[in-house]
Amino acid sequence: MVANDQEQIKIAREYFTRADQGRPDVLELFHEDAEIYFPKFGFGFGRNSFLEMVKGFEGVLEYIQHDYDRLNFIPSADYLIVEGTSQGRMSGKSWAGGETPGGRFCNAFKFRDGRIMSLHIYLDPDYTGEDEARFRWGKNRKW
């Protein structure tokens, strides 16, 4: 890995920490023209669109904690792919990536000028497995 890769990993780690703690200064990590993608939210443009996306969880997300020690970082030039798991509680129900259907994710970061220019988050937003009708293979799977 080159120095730039290490800097991008450092920024991504800081993003997960600040986001999990609900810190408003998470926005400082984003470029002012950042692009955000999240399932069911779609695309947002500008760093404040991150807050717009987060507002969709108000009143239901009690907490989220990414498993920092289990994050896999795949750097490539201006991009950093991060695969991992999270745990949390939403509307009184808990999830834990690797143990429940929800909680696995993959984030694609793109950097410009030392900031997050693009963040695309790929996951199933049904963290707690409420959408039982679409568990076509049953719930007795290895997660």
Regions found by a protein language model. Give the residues of each.
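A solvent-exposed, acidic/Ser-Thr-rich amphipathic alpha-helical stretch
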Residues: R23-A77
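Short, mixed-charge, low-aromatic patches
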Residues: D5-Y15, F38-F41, E62-H66, M117
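A beta-strand edge to alpha-helix "cap/lid" segment located at domain peripheries
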Residues: V2-N4, K55-W143
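Short, low-complexity N-terminal intrinsically disordered segments enriched in polar/charged residues
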Residues: M1-E32, W137-W143
